[in-house]
């Protein structure tokens, strides 16, 4: 059985990952939290609500990584890159679901993953990744005759904007249309800003309440509109996806993979 360690184990996402891993028949070998966290030393299973596992939450990154086959990390880019570096040194696989990576940070992640297999994906949902494939095909079919706008909604605690999933959706569409996403993405419209350019991809964000995550991509033509939407009802789809990725990554060749690789959509 695969031994999985979870970073951010006492958080909402970390708890759901622990539950999903146990349900999938994996072994929870380690549970990591930041130094000084009030739940360090407590049983990770009891914190997650799935019963005692005999695994105490720890702040010792090296020890936690040493004891696992795969580390699952939903934290921040800075923490994830540090964890990726340690996993590389110890030849352990890692699954990263953190969002908010800059292009430079993604490039660094690829460099750090030269010697180990790693999955880096802004969204672990099977449905969202099917949407990525649909968006690519649809953009190629529609071409430049349709304007593209993206709207994403999340809870009021989310720290990054726009979401990593929304950005990836924009990147997929831009790549399919032969555009540079960083050049055509429009995150801000206010006042007299002129007509919309044909190439731009608009990005709008909404933050409020407890919305887990909603994304809609609009392809807007003359007299017609196509919408591709995904709505997350709970975080469990992300946790199950991360465990699926962890089981898939073991034994793979070194390199940086994404959920399209995990799901065989490439």
From Swiss-Prot:
Where does the chain bind NAD(+)? 8-13, 33, 97-99, 121-124
Q: Which EC class is the enzyme in?
A: oxidoreductase
- Catalysed reactions, semicolon-separated: (S)-2,3,4,5-tetrahydrodipicolinate + NAD(+) + H2O = (2S,4S)-4-hydroxy-2,3,4,5-tetrahydrodipicolinate + NADH + H(+); (S)-2,3,4,5-tetrahydrodipicolinate + NADP(+) + H2O = (2S,4S)-4-hydroxy-2,3,4,5-tetrahydrodipicolinate + NADPH + H(+)
Tagged with keyword NADP? yes
Name the source's superkingdom: Bacteria
Task: List ligand-binding residues for NADP(+).
Answer: 34
UniProt entry keywords in alphabetical sequence:
Amino-acid biosynthesis, Cytoplasm, Diaminopimelate biosynthesis, Lysine biosynthesis, NAD, NADP, Oxidoreductase
Active site, renumbered: 154, 158
The compartments listed are: Cytoplasm
Pfam families tied to this protein: DapB_C, DapB_N
Q: Which family does it belong to?
A: Belongs to the DapB family.
Name of protein? 4-hydroxy-tetrahydrodipicolinate reductase
Recorded source organism is: Trichlorobacter lovleyi (strain ATCC BAA-1151 / DSM 17278 / SZ) (Geobacter lovleyi)
